[in-house]
Structure formats: C-alpha cells, structure tokens
Amino acid sequence: MHIVPEAVMKDMIKVYKALSDESRLRVLNLLFEKECCVCEVEQALEISQSKASRILSSLYDAGFLGLRKDGLWSLYSIDWTGMEPYLKDILEATRKGLKGNRQMKADRERLKTAVRAGPGCADKSCGVKTEESVAV
C-alpha cells in the first residue's frame, strides 16, 4: 500500500479545489490556447477584472500557472515545465475533457478578439501578481 505524505495530500486538495469551479476551468481552457493577461481573460469570459484576477491567482497558487512580466502586463500561462508530473496528467485530462464543450469553444472564439490594450491594461491593473510579489 502506498501512503501519500501529508504535504502532497494538502497540495492535491488545493489542486482539486482549483479545478472544482466552472470559471477556473474556463480560464484554464483559455490558457491552453495561449498566455493571457487579466484583461484578455476578462474580455473572453465576459467577467469583471476582479473576478479574473481572483481566478488567475487561485490557479497560480495551485501550481498550474507561470507568470512573466512584459511592460505593463503580467502574463499568465500554463507552467508545463515547472509543474509536478501528476499535475501535468491532471491538466492533460482536463484539456481533453473541455475540448468539445460548447461554452469552452465560445470562450476560445472570444479570446481570438480579446486585446491587451483595454482599460484594465492601460491603468496597470492587468496584473494580479508582479515578479516582486511572487519572489516574496
């Protein structure tokens, strides 16, 4: 019998909680396509900036996302290289499961027209975390 260490169990709980929300799955669906800033997520999902920020922060904290700064923008992407192998398996299964969903397809279509030059980006509210806050 294989016993899962307590720390791994806590990480797994955080991961499954992150995946247990439709909005977070919709954001992952976008990030499977390309890296995004908060305002692109906001536009593609037709949600508020604060909700997009909270979702990205939750997915980042669960270990799914990487972050890089580019001028005004904090750009989020799936962090395939820094991810634990079991997380990669979970995300691949999630990606396959979302592929044919009508809502997910519509979100991906809206992402194609989302722009990084929106009001959220212009006032620098596009990023949730900065490189400095991640390093702390």
Place the predicted regions along the sequence by residue.
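Residues within the DNA-recognition helix of helix-turn-helix
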Residues: I55
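Alpha-helical residues within the helix-turn-helix
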Residues: Q43, Y60-D61
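N-terminal helix-turn-helix DNA-binding core of bacterial DNA-binding proteins
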Residues: K10-K51, W73-G82
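C-terminal regulatory/oligomerization modules of transcriptional regulators
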Residues: M1-V8, G82-V136
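Beta-hairpin "wing" of winged helix-turn-helix
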Residues: D61-D70, S77
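A general structural signal for well-ordered secondary-structure junctions
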Residues: E22-L25, C37, L65, M104, ...
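Alpha-helical interaction segments
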Residues: P5-E6, S50, G63-L67
